[in-house]
């Protein structure tokens, strides 16, 4: 990691960080829209771009931390602008995480329900001591195979 020592380097570092934040925010917003619309496969295609941008943002953030004092002294206005952008990015990231968590919970619920239904169908229908049908035992369960090809 190269130290930032001049004003042009400081301006370039802030500009690069700002560009990374804006591009990653755009990818996250697109992913959020796609998942919200149920287009999970299209959203999954953004994973590589999202990972690359996140890695670049992490590296730029580490460089920023190492040179924070110089950056705040040499380009304070750009640093303030970047902080405002970062606050907006946090909101976008939070919304994205909520949408992804919701989609995950819904899909997990569907798989659990399907697994339970299949286990009930595979188990013998017998009556227990109380006169009611018994729930299938754990040994009655079978593996559930899913095809990712729709």
Feature map (PLM): residue ranges:
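Extended, charge-rich alpha-helical scaffolding segments
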Residues: 1-91
